[in-house]
Amino acid sequence: LGIGIRSGQLRIYELVLKSPTCLFYGVAGAGKTNILLTLTRDLCKKDGPCLYVSTEETLHYEKVGRQVEDYAYTLFTEVYSLDKLLELVFHTSYMNFQTLVVDSINSLYRAVAYEESSLAKFTLLMGFLRNMSELKGLKILASAQVRAGEEDVEASGMSLLDYYFDTIFQVGFEKNKRFVKLVKPRHKATPIKYFEINEKGVVWM
């Protein structure tokens, strides 16, 4: 972890490089998708092929289309049910991807959380992803949606996410600035990094 934090500065890319499983959670519009797209672009040019799974929308294709050569080693797809996401992840275990990106990993669980089998399916999904990371060396990057309370912001299914992900970042707003804060592993002084978003993705400040 030391190479990812120097003089109190949070070095996102270095932390992601050395961590098998990374999660970015935050409120809608905070910049989670842009962070994942930027990391995917930079990682997969060197360590492809990669699979990027969207469970919400396809607006990111416009940004990808403007940098199509930078995403030459990334396959994009969409799924819109928890069952289909599980099926896709199982099939991925037979493929040769180096990195799997899921944006977002808990949105489909949130949609069916009232169903009796949803927690079991979500737990199975998380366990299988962890297993692929440990046995096959597959890097897992994901975002998570949150529910906003009066005093705090917490991702749906956070207890499971915290258990299965090695490195967790909170993405949010501080006054007029966007930030990424390291939540796990925990530190006495919480490292934080500010960023902006332009037409190509995230620019770290």
Residue positions per predicted region:
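Short acidic active-site motifs
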Residues: 11, 84-88, 157
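Signal for well-folded cores of large energy- and translation-related assemblies
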Residues: 17, 28, 44, 90, ...
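Conserved P-loop
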Residues: 18-92
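P-loop NTPase motor core
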Residues: 79, 90-163
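Phosphate-binding/switch region of NTP-binding enzymes
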Residues: 138-205
